[in-house]
Amino acid sequence: MPHAVAVFNMRNVKGDVTFTNKGANVLVEAIFTKLPVGEHGFHIHMAGDLRGEGCKGACAHFHKGSRPGTHGGLPGSKRPRHTGDLGNISGTGTYKYTIRDLSAEELFGRSLIVHEDADDLGLGNEADSLTTGHSGRRIACAIIGRTMESC
């Protein structure tokens, strides 16, 4: 049973993302039914404030821990990464991730963002590669909230 959900219902992006606690980890399942062509960076951001052009109020990528973290690849990657770095999505379909040492409840009120461009996973030569993956502007955003099953 999912504990948290984020719903994308924008003109260019449609989909549901659920977060289910599995022991000390959280299973993330994203199902997109509409997505622009190409690869898009996909991240959990710190805040659920979607005000402002391009969801600027969502702040930076979410990172659990005392250090700010460095941008990186998918959950489970051996390279350093922000807790909220989910790599790239491309096309409609289902994407699944397991994020270790995190609960769905820690994500309540945060946001999910789909970016315009591919995430370089922190491997690029651009100035923002180690903070945002040089993934471009924010094209869709959704707040992560409690599911009715978790009430």
Model-derived segments and spans:
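N-terminal leader/targeting pre-sequences
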Residues: 1-39, 44-151
